[in-house]
From Swiss-Prot:
GO terms for biological process: modified amino acid biosynthetic process. GO terms for molecular function: ATP binding; glutamate-cysteine ligase activity. The keyword Iron does not apply. It is an enzyme of class 6 (ligase). HAMAP family: Glu_cys_ligase_2. Its EC number is 6.3.2.2. This is Putative glutamate--cysteine ligase 2-3. Keywords: ATP-binding, Ligase, Nucleotide-binding.
Length: 363
């Protein structure tokens, strides 16, 4: 394994947003990825648009920004440009963790050799991955800092899931989960919470063992909720559902950036204990009661978000993302994306109406 850690300016931030491509007539997923990529050729900087496993998914990558404030200003305009490209290709753009009714297994796999190989190796779990996430990259100075940042972010994965929960429906049914995406993603190997690494060297050894065993080709086949990304010189948070509102994307990016910068303030937590809170957040979203294992107390997810923001505000001021971090408070005091989708269904009585709402709200 390449053991050098990429050099990016510390604590710069970028995101990858995975969008659903929707048939305007049926409101079902449509495998239009190749058409959208062709439409975007020359229209956007190289590398901005990418395919994922499902041909009904469009990944949009931002550049690295010096501050989350810059990211927040850029996101709406970027989304607008991508939406126009999708419309020229005969698709609508939706940002949410899962489609309300399209069968996952009916979505074609993209033609990339990497994803064809994944499909061949995994079978059914790969065919279930019609899910859409938000990935946040934060640059850190080196490998040891990356391991500490991964640890700090991992213990807060349940809170990220609660705040971002935006996938209540699966194949036409209400799952009674706030984030069905979190459970579907768990079907694939090397997903979920990362192992607890004591050092960069331990992470490298872990990956090298998996490579020698023939399980993976490189570290990018470790699809944990948060992982080091040596090539980019970042830590990558992968747990959140895709966000309909770009303001929420920016708020979650600010929380991620602050935790990465303040990683030394947070003790590592046993992943088996964090897993319990992850389940509670997956099931109940911001209505979850999370257990603080170090403080031996139960705390409501909304309260946990407020306490964490308060703790991180001095860091946010240094990073210039105070306003965006306070956006986490706005999320914690309002309905989740999952709640809003359910409210549309209750009001309109149709999952197609939920898709229409999501398409209109994906600003």
């Amino acid at each position: 394994m390449e053991t050098r850690f990429g050099a990016s300016p510390p604590y710069t931030v970028g995101v990858e947003e995975e969008f659903q491509l929707i048939d305007p007539r049926t409101r079902a997923l449509t495998p239009k990825i190749e058409e959208v990529l062709a439409a975007g050729d020359g229209e956007l900087p190289e590398g901005t648009l990418a395919s994922e496993l499902s041909a009904s998914c469009l990944e949009v990558r931002t550049p690295a920004y010096a501050s989350v404030a810059e990211l927040a200003r850029a996101l709406p305009a970027l989304r607008a440009r991508v939406r126009r490209l999708a419309e020229r290709s005969g698709a609508r753009l939706v940002s949410a963790g899962a489609h309300p009714f399209s069968p996952a297994a009916e979505q074609p796999i993209t033609g990339k050799p990497r994803y064809r190989k994944v499909d061949e190796e995994m079978g059914w779990p790969a065919r279930m991955q019609a899910i859409y996430g938000l990935h946040v990259h934060v640059a850190v100075p080196g490998g040891e800092e990356a391991v500490r940042a991964v640890s700090a972010l991992a213990r807060h994965v349940p809170l990220f899931i609660a705040l971002s929960a935006n996938s209540p429906f699966w194949e036409g049914r209400d799952t009674r989960l706030a984030s069905v995406r979190a459970k579907v993603f768990g079907l694939i190997p090397r997903s979920g919470l990362p192992p607890r690494f004591a050092s960069w060297e331990e992470f490298v050894r872990h990956v090298e063992r998996l490579v020698r065993a023939g399980s993976i080709r490189d570290y990018t086949f470790c699809w944990w909720d948060v992982r080091p990304h040596p090539k980019l010189g970042t830590v990558e948070l992968r747990a959140p559902d895709a966000q309909t509102d770009p303001g929420r994307t920016a708020a979650l990016a600010a929380l991620c950036q602050c935790l990465a910068a303040a990683a030394e303030e947070f003790e590592p937590e046993d992943p088996l204990l964090t897993e319990e809170n992850k389940w509670r957040a997956t099931r109940h979203g911001l209505e979850a009661e999370l257990y603080d294992f170090s403080g031996q107390r139960t705390v409501a997810a909304r309260r946990a978000a407020e306490e964490l923001v308060g703790r991180l505000l001095p860091v946010a001021r240094e990073l210039g993302c105070e306003a965006e971090l306070e956006g986490v408070l706005e999320i914690s005091r309002s309905a989740t994306g999952a709640d809003r989708q359910r409210a549309v269904l209750a009001r309109e009585g149709s999952l197609k109406s939920v898709v229409d709402y999501l398409a209109e709200a994906t600003a």
